[in-house]
Amino acid sequence: MTDPLIPAVLVFRDNGTPFSPLYDDIYHSAVGGLEQARYVFLRGNSLPDRWQGRRIFTVLETGFGMGINFLMTWAAWRADPLRCERLHFVSTEKHPFTVGDLRKAVAATISDPEIAALAQALANAWPTLVPGTHRLEFDEGRVVLTLVFGDAQERLPALRLRADAFYLDGFAPARNPELWTPMIFKALARLAGEGATFATCSSAGDIKRALIQCGFEYRKVDGFGWKRAMLVGHFAPRWRVRRHEPPAPLAVDERHAVVIGAGLAGCAVIERLAARGWRVTSLERHASVAQEASGNPAGVFHPMISRDDSIASRVTRAGFLYTLRRWAALERLGHAPLRGGQGLLQIAADENEARSISEAIAAFGYPGDYVTPVSAAEAQRLAGMPLARGGWFFPHGGWIDPASLCAAQCAAAGPLLERRFGVDVARIERSGGQWTVFDTSGEAIARAPVVIVASAHDAARIAGLQHAPTRSIRGQLTLLPPGAVLPPLQMPVIGEGYAVPLADGVTLTGATYELDDPDTSLRADGHLENLERVAQMLPAFANVADPARSTALTGRVAFRCVTSDRMPMIGQLADEAQAALDAQRLRGAWPLDLPRTDGLYGAFAYGSRGLVWAALGAELIASQLEGEPWPLERDLAEDIDPARFLLRALRQGAVS
């Protein structure tokens, strides 16, 4: 179970130095935090020289604290005309500051106006204090900060990245010994790229021994300020110290990808690849974007709360928070999708659920800007009409027009995107490092070194997957005209069903959930089912749940694509043919052991959570493709890996 995130407590010593009472240690040298960062970590890792001429450079830090090392690294990157194209800075933090305390800490420490401006940008982007991985982007996405909130002993082994430099900057080993254990250094060794360097203020004997045991070489140099010595060094193992190599970028002659499908999944991939400079060809069988399940007039987005903080809850939390940042970035670029005001209510199924979920919210320590339990009276005030029960309020949840989101993402891709509609893809073939896409007439219609299949129900067929058990679920929506329910609903309400007040006064309700039902026609019993379920939450809707009136209602039918475990299929696809040949050897395999198909990725089976999964899924695929740090923990990525069903079949001896 996920441990609650406990924020740092900020106090200041008499000399003004930020201090942690939890660890009885200072956050930076009293001689000067900026100078310490420059001397110990930048100079200690030979930066900026080592990133010059590189496309991607990745720094991994243990202990973000108040972010001074990141700010100084960012400033050095900005000042270097030979800087790398994209700087990744990944940092763990068990006790992050609240944004208010972060502002206080940097205000007391930083007088340099350039660094202060960067600190202000960091504070403005500071994530919600919930456990997990939070990816922030600065300088048009060329500087990427990935904050990993939680215990480093648990979080470092869950990272998937190739580090070029390590900043070992936890509190002193005597104050915070858990951050200097052999387990930590083993985790770092697993993540070290070729020639990776490190620097640390400490020169303790235990640390030296742990470094050597894990494949690092060190040397002692003059320390900073009152410290007599510090350690610097590099990764130079004399024997194999890890089972799997860190991720590397796909070697391609041309940065060009074909994306099959232009719904929520495909358009998110288009935007994330184009943001990295990839040329993208979009193939869509319909006449425009978002024509199938992504074409509903509105969709709701919100986190998922569970008593045990399940895998689905963790993936959805990461996706929800990342999605909000991506949408805000689109809006800053002038590509604003149509969405409602902030706020969404989830109504408990009964009093027992209301109590247990409220207890879970308290136990996990979720902050009020993420979720808040509400009574029936409080929920009624927010919704503007009576409710059957209380539940919980998501202040940043809401509704959005999916088609407008897809259009905004394509617009953000600009001239790097070629869009082709009315194209019905039948199959793909790989030869000579290139994928060729064929239509249903057998004609080759596109070629590229990379293909991302984001076509929902057709994805497994196009990719030739045998171990991708997806199914179709029919969903019928019901639209109520303005004034059908009074007083009007003020925000989306979800629970057994959902009701969404749209911008034009129409209220959207839904949706039915009918497995393997291919009927595309609107059905009166479907409208009635939707309204009756909503009426269980919102009694005012009982007046419109009338069988005699249901035949006159309008709506829409769409089909969700889901897997048997209800998790999406996101990431590089396995080479199933090669896995079958190696089935005996792979029977006890882990996901990283599986053979993968070069240049072939999937983004499908999003079910009813496409709005909160698509952006994160696209970022994961782009990161895998580029050899960048993954935007979520490895165990979560494995739970949405398209190869997970192949892996289960191998373990059961069902592949031959």
Swiss-Prot record:
It is found in: Cytoplasm. Keywords: Cytoplasm, FAD, Flavoprotein, Methyltransferase, Multifunctional enzyme, Oxidoreductase, S-adenosyl-L-methionine, Transferase, tRNA processing. Its cofactor is FAD. InterPro entries: FAD-dep_OxRdtase, FAD/NAD-bd_sf, MnmC-like_methylTransf, SAM-dependent_MTases_sf, tRNA_MAMT_biosynth_bifunc_MnmC, tRNA_MNMC2, tRNA_S-uridine_synth_MnmC_C. One of its GO terms (biological process) is methylation. One of its GO terms (cellular component) is cytoplasm. The keyword Flavoprotein applies. Its main location: cytoplasm. The keyword Transferase applies. Pfam families: DAO, Methyltransf_30. Residues 1-236 are annotated as: tRNA (mnm(5)s(2)U34)-methyltransferase. NCBIfam families: MnmC_Cterm, PRK01747.1-2, PRK01747.1-4, tRNA_MNMC2. Catalyzes the last two steps in the biosynthesis of 5-methylaminomethyl-2-thiouridine (mnm(5)s(2)U) at the wobble position (U34) in tRNA. Catalyzes the FAD-dependent demodification of cmnm(5)s(2)U34 to nm(5)s(2)U34, followed by the transfer of a methyl group from S-adenosyl-L-methionine to nm(5)s(2)U34, to form mnm(5)s(2)U34. In the N-terminal section; belongs to the methyltransferase superfamily. tRNA (mnm(5)s(2)U34)-methyltransferase family. In the C-terminal section; belongs to the DAO family. HAMAP family: MnmC (MF_01102). This is tRNA 5-methylaminomethyl-2-thiouridine biosynthesis bifunctional protein MnmC. The lineage of its organism: Bacteria, Pseudomonadati, Pseudomonadota, Betaproteobacteria, Burkholderiales.
